[in-house]
Amino acid sequence: CIADYFHFTDYYISGKDTLNLDYYVLSYNKQKALKHFQQVKPMLNCFEHYFGPYPFQNDGFSLIETPYLGMEHQSAIAYGNNYLPGYNGNKNFIAGLDFDYIIVHEAGHEWWGNSITTNDIADMWIHEGFCTYSEVLYVECIYGYQKMIEYIQNQKRFVRNDKPIVGPYGVNKKGSSDMYQKGSLMLHTLRNLLDNDELWFSLIKGISNDFKYKIVDGVDIINYITNKCNLNLDSFFDQYLHTSKIPLLEYKIQKEGREYVLLCRWDAINNFDMKLLVNNGKEDIWIFPESEWKEFTLGNFDIKNFSIRDDLFYIDTKKVN
């Protein structure tokens, strides 16, 4: 006998389809599980909204209690988060977020990792970056946009920037564990760089549907994104995927007459020219920094209200004299 498991079932309606939900929990956790797993159906609804239909309809969806935290086995997720919110009770210091991290993250892998799988573990950012970003979208779906911003900002403190998140190819070696949070932050940055949520969400769903049940390389996903966006994103992906640094915006502000002028430049890889939002306390303003100093007029405003929108873009900033 493996353990004294209690098995209970539920179902999730998706359009004209019915998805079987099976839960296997230790018998003494029956009442906890009956209540705790109620978050599964709203989560599946969010993920189907963003990524398309659950990819393993015939297999069903299962959670199986285990003595370890979790693993994304296809249609049979190992669950060991002790029926607690966050990561084994750690809510990551964001008030009001009470979801179970293991359920949400491992379920996200049904789309990112199980349905779409990388050819080489060097490109595991496709699994973990997109799946960690699925947590972000889940928060936006259930708790709203502002809580999503708080959640994505909190992910920054887990990034070490120790080495690139893409590993060497052909030698069975992963890149940095930053593939989780840094990968998510890269996608969040790309969403705001596009400045078009209709395009962004069609892009995410398009990747999920067009590469369903396929083995992919990182270049497949990057080419898909650049073609759909009709943008040259080579330097963007090179910076975030193939270096251990994030772009640094050096800047200074000067007053010319009644107006303030922003001088800035990127300290990043060659040809990095990502546009960026700043705010003068009245409105967001697009700027277009490059590697050389450029000047942007911000208008007449209270300088104390100036901010760089690093809540929307994963960058470092440095004010210089």
Regions inferred by a protein language model and the residue ranges of each:
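Amphipathic alpha-helical substructures
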Residues: P55, S176-E256, L262
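Soluble non-cytosolic domains of exported or imported proteins
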Residues: K30-K41, F93-I94, D98, I102, ...
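Generic, well-ordered alpha-helical scaffold segments in large soluble proteins
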Residues: Q39-Y50, N82, I102, E106, ...
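Beta-strand-rich binding/interaction modules
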Residues: L233-D234, L249, I253-D310
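Acidic/His/Gly-enriched intrinsically disordered linker/tail segments
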Residues: M124, E128-T189, L193, F211
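Zinc-dependent metallopeptidase catalytic helix centered on the HExxH motif
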Residues: K41, C46, Y79-G80, P85-I149
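Short acidic/polar inter-strand loop motif in beta-rich domains
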Residues: D310-N321
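Hydrophobic helix-coil surface modules that form long, contiguous segments used
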Residues: C1-V104
